[in-house]
Amino acid sequence: MSTKYETMYILRPDLTDEIIDQTITRYQTLLAEQGAAPVETQHRGKRRLAYELKKFKEGIYVQMNYDAPTTAVAELEKAFRLSEEVIRFLTVREED
């Protein structure tokens, strides 16, 4: 059974456009492999952070909306924790 989720994650501001695109594609592919569908991704661009995170004052915001089983969300968050590119993330379940 799948549920609707929204995930917002913040990438380091010093990444190149190529690495940003590769990172976004990696997480979209990870979700698809875990049974998520459809993955809608919005690249929100570089924004100033309200406070410093891991010594960064800016971050690149990316939002994903998708239907997925809870195991897919767990795998995605595990990948975020292990990634050096992601400085913060949040996943919430959308209400119908």
Curated annotation (Swiss-Prot):
Binds together with bS18 to 16S ribosomal RNA. One of its GO terms (molecular function) is structural constituent of ribosome. One of its GO terms (biological process) is translation. Signal peptide: none annotated. Belongs to the bacterial ribosomal protein bS6 family. InterPro entries: Ribosomal_bS6, Ribosomal_bS6_sf, Ribosomal_S6_plastid/chlpt, Transl_elong_EF1B/ribsomal_bS6. Keywords: Ribonucleoprotein, Ribosomal protein, RNA-binding, rRNA-binding. This is Small ribosomal subunit protein bS6. The keyword Secreted does not apply. It comes from Gloeobacter violaceus (strain ATCC 29082 / PCC 7421). One of its GO terms (cellular component) is ribonucleoprotein complex. The keyword Ribosomal protein applies. It comes from the Bacteria.
